[in-house]
Amino acid sequence: AALMTDTTVDIELVASCSEMKVNRVLTELYYDAMTQVPTPTYTPEELDFAKQITEEAGLINDGTLFSGLEPLEDEPVPIAIGTDASQVSHTVPLITLSAATMCKGTPLHHWAAAKQAGMTIGQKGMLYVARCMAEGTKLLMETPGSIEKAWELHKLTP
């Protein structure tokens, strides 16, 4: 329709977002913390709920929930989400953690995501990552020189 009506568009760039500046010092320290915190386990009722919700939503999944901890990657893994945390990461050393709060393959901003995140499946994931943040911060405070190393790396990373 735009072509048929000779519609034109003027684009004005008002702001832009930077990619996340990864700090390997913090990444390794907080990953160590994540290995020390037990990952969530799910009840038969939660697994049944997950299976039912994925069927209702028409998702390609049998209700499988992720359990465990992925190995730490050698290189940063791009994630397809928008966040202003990436801007913050260019000012101070920053770490972000995430955990499963819904079945594999559930699209974000989908009603099935909200329904899973709002029940015990989501609560367990959120509590897990909160414990990991607390444990990681404890390790950061207890590991001599870690804050200085994180800042040093931050200053060296473009």
Show where each model-derived region lies.
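Metal-dependent amide/peptide-bond hydrolase catalytic core
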Residues: A1-P158
